[in-house]
Amino acid sequence: MRASYGHANTLNVRWTIVPEAIRSTVAVMTRSPLVRRAVAPLLLLGTAVPLGAQQAPSLTDKVAAVLATAPAGTRFGLVVTDESGREIISINPDQRFIPASNTKMFTTATAFDTLSGIDQPDPAGGTGVRLERNGGGAPDVVIEGRGDARLSSAADCKVDCLAELADAVAAKTRVVGNVIGDDSWFPDERWGPGMSWNNIPTRSGTGISALTLDDNELGATVTAGALGMPPKVDLPDYYTIDNRAVTVASGETHIAFDRDVFAYVVRLTGTIALGAKPEPLRFGIDDPARFTAWRFRQLLAARGVRVTGTIGARHRPLSPADDPAIRKGAPAARPPAPEALARLTPAPLIEDLTIINKVSQNLHADLMLRRVSRLNGSGSIADGQVAVRAMLARAGVARTEFDFSDGSGMSSYNRVAPRGAVTMLRWIATQPWGAAWRATLPIGGEGGLAKRYGGTALDHKIFAKTGTLNATNALSGYMITKGGRTLTFSIFANDVPEGTSAIAAMDRAVLTVAAEN
């Protein structure tokens, strides 16, 4: 359809046959409500042709119409391929989008492709403890991390427990000096480029460290106090609270918190009503190595071990040696590791890879990128990016179709084209580990996709990684259609207006594809 505009209130239309791709682009990219109101009658007029010339809407037309119901301004990219690799839908296939947590697909695929023995216990990643003697005094205790994401200090811990290391120290000595958390296995890069500063105080932006404990989070509970007074806050003494919140007579609970980077004072604001249920909060940790030392001192004291010194952290500053470009591809130097008094053996990495994709655990994903980085590099983000690029080159993904700055998708610098994502997904399906990787994805009707596909035609028939970030929604994976076909797809929505979501339109589009195949 071509339209020529004359007077402001008249529309002179000359009808021609328009390629489907142009019509679908109009349907998807016409976001302004005013333009939509102008274009919609034209699309209807375009169908007012003799009966013999009418054509049924194509699948792309149907999907484009669904996506056009998303909030105005949303930009979509979608690629769907059949079993042979033929693209049956292609909308902005090579445009680059912020992928949000779809980034985790690329991180976990690299881990499957490069790490050996992921279905076996993981002694290489286990946390260790050693005693360091400096002169004739009591030895210092050093807890050394090697990138394990699942170390726990919970009272009910059964595997990978910090308490086991405290038992080993208590069996060796009853007096120690300083307690030091050592995360120098990786260089000190606690946040990736492009991390939003406002996320840092939260669990979503907690620091990344080779020595990680309890997901690098600290919980607190806020309970209503007397009317007009600050609420009560139950919080371990790692942080102190600047309590500016108020107990009110009624209304919904609205509690917010903030904290300066590397500070230990949390500012609490907002309101909680009399009789309201307690409000749980989760705080991020900026220095996980120090946090682990703090917690380890408590465990030692509970075992009767006297600590005469202080708690501290030992970091390895980022240096030129952590940049593979400066090393010109040479492996990173590996200084000899000190002997440990005791070392834990975490559960198989496949369990953590499942957590990363199904739960979308940011910290674990960024630690996995660094684990991959240590194979030939230093544990730096840059070395991890080299590993991801090498995997994508093997998968046949064009270099122009991606850029990554972290392993989790929290960075706003990440970019992926839908065609690149589908190319990787199809390659994964051909790998010996492809079925195991697919099993780590959320499943329709369960977990993160329970509310989105439960009770639909794709209930337990879609296996896909979700993604949500500011102004971004994403979903990529595999679906089993009404006709029993297995399709590979990737759909991104960017520039979603604040306070809205494109998820509903995306899910209807995916269901439309499944119903038509």
Q: What is the meaning of each model-derived region?
A:
Residues V39-A48:
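Bacterial N-terminal signal peptides
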Residues A68-I91, G312:
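A short, well-structured edge-of-sheet supersecondary motif
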Residues I88-S90, V359, D366-N517:
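Small-residue-rich helix-loop
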